[in-house]
Amino acid sequence: MAYVIAEPCVATCDTACVPVCPVDCIHGPLAADEISRIPEGERKTRLAGLQLYIDPESCICCGACENECPVGAIFDEDELPAEWQRYREINARFFDDRAKERAPEET
């Protein structure tokens, strides 16, 4: 099982969880340093619809990220609230799409 980032992260993208991950499995559409340069007052607008994601294939379930998340967005997959179950698939799809983008074109 892996950890999942859910709705409280959307448009927040707080990166406090990133440096505590021992396997570097937390990523997003923007790099953590890019996010940190966005002024706090502009984040909701500039990060609308964006969030961070945990790679379910790399996560070692140590829980370090869950304890560090200031918005309470990270859950053990088995403890994900019912209203946020869709985020399990959203997290996995982010990494599937990313792998497809990086795969060399077949000829």
Swiss-Prot record:
PROSITE patterns: 4FE4S_FER_1, 4FE4S_FER_2. Residues 1-31, 50-79 form the 4Fe-4S ferredoxin-type domain. One of its GO terms (molecular function) is electron transfer activity. The keyword Iron-sulfur applies. Binds 2 [4Fe-4S] clusters. [4Fe-4S] cluster 1 binds at residues 9, 13, 17, 69. [4Fe-4S] cluster 2 binds at residues 21, 59, 62, 65. The keyword Electron transport applies. Pfam families: Fer4 (PF00037). Keywords: 4Fe-4S, Electron transport, Iron, Iron-sulfur, Metal-binding, Transport. Its cofactor is [4Fe-4S] cluster. PANTHER family: FERREDOXIN (PTHR42859:SF2), OXIDOREDUCTASE (PTHR42859). Ferredoxins are iron-sulfur proteins that transfer electrons in a wide variety of metabolic reactions. Fdx2 can receive electrons from both FdR_A and FdR_B ferredoxin reductases, with a preference for FdR_B compared with FdR_A, and transfer the electrons to the cytochrome P450 CYP260A1. This is Ferredoxin Fdx8. The lineage of its organism: Bacteria, Pseudomonadati, Myxococcota, Polyangia, Polyangiales.
